[in-house]
Amino acid sequence: MESSRGKPGLNGSGGGAAAFDYSSRRGYYTGAGAALPPLAAGSRAPPVDPCCVVLRVFVLLGTLASAVVMAADRQSTTVQIAAGEELAPPLRVPVTAKWTYSSAFVYFVVANAMVFAFSAAALAAVRRRSAVVPVMVGDLVAMALLFSAVGAAAQFGLLGERGNAHVRWAKVCDVYGPFCERAMAAVVVALIAAFADLVLLMLTILTIHKASSYY
């Protein structure tokens, strides 16, 4: 009479069958009848790269500084306007420059504030494995926001610094010198933060690539 034999199962059931755990993509070979090793405490949390944390903090502080400096940028001064008559004294007119007068600067402040809020949320979720991919996608969006905001603000700043002779737009930074200097300082800090976000995104992709069990 034919003796019955246990068929090897996926979880190690069956007489003398080798167990194979499919909890990971590579699998874990346990040998005949061997028990699976217990998961170490905290093994569900992804490894934290100190460089990524430092870059994230820099992006957080850089976007905060850029948004605050630009949002607080304001200057009031007086300009002289020549009167119609040659012998009449020039008129002194008070004028004010504010970041809200430029849609490019408004977009710059809003974009930096959004990236700051995202960076704070990403730091809070740094130990969550389920947040790795959403944070990576968010970094991509944040980087695009920062570079576009920097480009818009820098273009408007250069227009105020140099003017445009083709359309007869006069430069205004000779009148609003401190205003332009603070605005360009905020743009430079945001540009550095954007490059830091780019490096952070590349490190995150490299970390996921190394940790993936397909490679």
UniProtKB/Swiss-Prot annotation:
Pfam family, one: CASP_dom
Residues in the Extracellular compartment per record: 73-103, 152-185
A GO-annotated cellular component: plasma membrane
Top-level taxonomic group: Eukaryota
Positions of transmembrane segments: 52-72, 104-124, 131-151, 186-206
Cell membrane recorded as keyword: yes
Membrane topology: Multi-pass membrane protein
Cytoplasmic topology ranges: 1-51, 125-130, 207-215
Keywords, sorted A to Z: Cell membrane, Membrane, Transmembrane, Transmembrane helix
Compartments where located: Cell membrane
Major location category of this protein: membrane
Family label: Belongs to the Casparian strip membrane proteins (CASP) family.
Cross-referenced PANTHER family: CASP-LIKE PROTEIN 1U1
Quaternary data: Homodimer and heterodimers.
Protein name per its UniProtKB record: CASP-like protein 1E1
Organism expressing this protein natively: Oryza sativa subsp. japonica
Lineage: Eukaryota, Viridiplantae, Streptophyta, Embryophyta, Tracheophyta
